[in-house]
Regions:
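Alpha-helical transmembrane segments of multi-pass small-molecule/ion transporters
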Residues: 1-262
């Protein structure tokens, strides 16, 4: 627990630095957007890909399969719980349900998993990320607009993160090990993930209207559902499963990440 709190404390300090950098004019809105794009399209895929540069074992492959299956289960739990507690009564019910179900598991989840569990954590997280994209661009789109086009769905699924998963998985199953210089290069790029993500998060936070957010009581309720109720429901179900605790914790962490936007 102390290690977790220490890692989270470090991340919050870097986030605070991002706020300061924006307030002092070192970051602006355009730079923040470019850094965010660089993070999502270059750094995150590098972290994901290099997480597969580990020695192949049947046990790891089976565990990865469990990670995919548990991720599907986690989303089904989230959808069910959200349908029960949020309902369709609010004018913004679709947005609220989308907010509770879909976390920012790439932006925040990868740095957390990488900081706490290293490559193993990111390795297991890739299962959740893949399932996230599948659900988000099908169920999520249908939830918001009532339908999902096949071409648009396929295009959206071909994100850099998913490409990183596919290439990494091919190398892992095919026992393809890159030269150490390339792995070190990917590792070096990936090491930017946590500090860059937190700096961007801080700069984004500095642009937000916090006063209006803090005075909207509905936001507190939805946040409680997203950050407490839903992760607790998933953790309760997972507590009965005799599986790798690191894998289970990584998926719970992904579920408990803040709201995603796309």
């Amino acid at each position: 627990l102390n290690i977790v709190l220490e890692k989270i404390g470090i991340m919050f300090l870097i986030l605070a630095l991002g706020v300061i950098c924006f307030k002092k004019g070192l970051f602006d809105e355009a730079l923040t957007k470019r850094l965010s794009t660089f993070l999502l399209q270059v750094v995150n895929p590098a972290v994901i890909f290099v997480s597969y540069q580990i020695s192949y074992t049947n046990e790891l492959l089976v565990s990865l399969g469990y990670s995919f299956a548990l991720s599907v289960l986690a989303f089904l739990i989230q959808i069910a719980v959200t349908y029960l507690v949020v309902g369709k009564h609010s004018v913004n019910s679709a947005v609220e349900r989308l907010s509770v179900i879909y976390s920012n598991c790439g932006f925040f989840g990868i740095p957390l998993a990488n900081s706490l569990f290293g490559r193993e954590g990111v390795f297991f997280l890739t299962g959740y990320l893949t399932v996230f994209y599948l659900f988000f661009w099908t169920h999520g789109v249908i939830l918001m607009i009532g339908k999902s086009g096949v071409k648009e769905t396929v295009r959206n699924l071909l994100s850099p993160a998913i490409v990183g998963v596919v290439l990494g998985l091919v190398c892992f199953v095919g026992r393809i090990k890159l030269p150490s210089v390339l792995v070190d290069a990917f590792d070096s790029v990936g090491s930017m993930n946590t500090p860059l993500a937190m700096l961007v998060a801080g700069a984004t936070l500095a642009q937000s209207n916090l006063v209006s957010s803090f005075t909207n009581l509905r936001i507190y309720l939805i946040s409680a559902f997203k950050l407490l109720l839903v992760p607790m429901a998933v953790a309760l179900v997972f507590s009965f499963l005799p599986l790798d605790p690191v894998m289970l914790l990584v998926i719970i962490i992904a579920v408990a990440c803040p709201v995603a936007a796309s």
